[in-house]
Design a protein with these regions (language model features):
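Short His/Asp/Glu-rich catalytic/ion-coordination signatures at enzyme active sites or charged loops
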Residues: 2-31, 181-195
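Contiguous, amphipathic alpha-helical segments that mediate oligomerization or scaffolding
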Residues: 5, 15-50, 201-220
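Aromatic- and glycine-enriched beta-alpha-beta binding-site module
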Residues: 71-130
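Charge-rich, low-complexity terminal tails
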Residues: 168-221
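Extended cationic-aromatic binding surfaces that line active-site or macromolecule-binding grooves
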Residues: 35-91
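Well-ordered alpha/beta subsegment
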Residues: 3, 138-142, 218-219
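Sequence-level motif detector for i,i+2 pairs with an aromatic at +2
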Residues: 61, 80, 107, 176-178
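Compact, glycine/acidic-enriched structural inserts
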Residues: 105-164
Length: 221
């Protein structure tokens, strides 16, 4: 699991994002893919100790294709410059919250939550936050959680959404357009021989947030 080698390959791919270069380095990419799946296998095994719902997940099913869909994009680069894996008990296409690891030179992260929820599901999660605000705050305002995830949601409304009390005392928690969290890590993170332990610590905190949101999300799936 030589993560610096994976990052080095991705850096060179971003500088030579052509089919010709990729074909010339296809064997190297296959080694990168194998190494990344080995990393995921290790993480899955460790997460399963506190979240047995992911114990059946296979590394191959967590990974995303490196090929970009360029049909509707002005950027015709054929390959992504990152590699990612989403450890999700219900599959990587589910709205169910899981554990995401993203490797990209200069933009690595550990993340999770639910992106692009249908509007009725998003409304239900917001309502759950309102109805259980003290429980939600006990999770997201816990220093152990905020150490990794100081912000809830990637994008936010400017005002409280329609149908919710305008005087709600914690508006930032229901203005979220998504319920996701992310911990950005430097490339040097992986130089630490104990980086797996740190990843597990991050995801252990993430589980608390995931459990709260999944309680509502799973009613829709």
């Amino acid at each position: 699991m030589n993560i610096p080698e994976i990052l080095d390959f991705l850096k060179r791919l971003s500088e030579n994002n052509t089919r010709e270069w990729f074909q010339e380095h296809k064997a190297e990419y296959q080694n990168v893919q194998s190494s990344f799946e080995n990393l995921l296998a290790t993480i899955i095994a460790r997460i399963s100790l506190f979240d047995e719902s992911v114990s059946h997940v296979r590394p191959h099913d967590c990974t995303y294709r490196i090929y970009r869909d360029i049909r509707f994009s002005a950027d015709k680069s054929p390959y992504k410059n990152h590699i990612g894996g989403y450890i999700n008990a219900r599959g990587k296409k589910s709205n169910h919250c899981g554990y995401y690891i993203h490797l990209e030179p200069g933009n690595c992260m550990l993340a999770g939550g639910s992106w692009c929820m249908p509007s009725n599901m998003l409304k239900a999660v917001r309502q759950s936050v309102v109805d259980n605000i003290e429980e939600f705050r006990s999770i997201v305002e816990d220093p152990a959680f905020k150490k990794y995830f100081p912000v809830i949601g990637e994008s936010h409304l400017k005002t409280i959404p329609k149908g919710f009390p305008k005087d709600f005392p914690y508006p930032e928690y229901i203005k979220c357009k998504d319920y996701t969290v992310a911990y950005v890590i430097p490339d040097s993170f992986f130089n630490n021989p104990l980086f797996i332990d740190e990843i597990v610590s991050v995801f252990r905190q993430l589980k608390r947030f995931a459990d709260f949101t999944n309680y509502t999300i799973d009613d829709f799936e």
